[in-house]
Amino acid sequence: KQKICATIDVHNIDTMKLFLDTADTELIEKYYQTNLIDGVTTNPTLIMKSGRDPEDVYQQLIDLGIDDISMEVVGDFDGMFIEGLRLFRKFGKSATIKVPCTPDGLRACRELARDLVNVNVTLIFSPAQAILAAKAGAKYVSPFVGRVDDNSFDGIDLVDQISDIYSIQNIRKTEILAASVRDVKTVSDSFGAGA
């Protein structure tokens, strides 16, 4: 199943970005050829379920010209940090390392960012988590809009709150990448809320 993620720098509309959230390389190639897709977020578990090696998929995406690929790492701090550095060294600036918003994930984000590695902090369910991720040096925060909605809260309101906080606090280095987006209306609403 593919999804579209949306991000926008609230200070510069020209930086609006669309990311695909899928492991389907044929679909990625199809949409990337439109010149409207700015990046891809991936999940190694989904890639492996398709019978492919995640690193082969990453290389195929880079060969297509995609230069912003969120590559998820898992484990404790040491595991995420070491794997994140390894992926960055192998794939260069095309690798944005995706970590969960957990204490170990935030610590890994901080250390990777110090090594100039771009990091996407995922599993954001509150403004407080987005603040911590920005403080840790994340390039992207990924609030899970659809999952927030599933739990009887307003995912778009979450994006709006994060956007307001980032704007008030002049946080410019961290972009909001709305995740778990399930339909076109939510993509539009996410952009309207500052993602």
Stretches with model-predicted labels:
Residues 16-19, 24-28, 34-36, 41-114, ...:
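Active-site beta->alpha loop and helix N-cap motifs at the rims of alpha/beta catalytic domains
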Residues 27-32, 83, 108, 126-136, ...:
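Catalytic cores of alpha/beta
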Residues 59-69, 106-117, 155-176:
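Alpha-helix-loop-beta-strand connector modules within alpha/beta enzyme cores
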Residues 72-74, 98-100, 120-124, 177-179:
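Structural motif
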Residues 123-158, 165:
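Histidine/lysine/aspartate-rich catalytic loop segments that bind and position anionic ligands
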Residues 142, 174, 191-195:
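Active-site capping/gating regions of soluble enzymes
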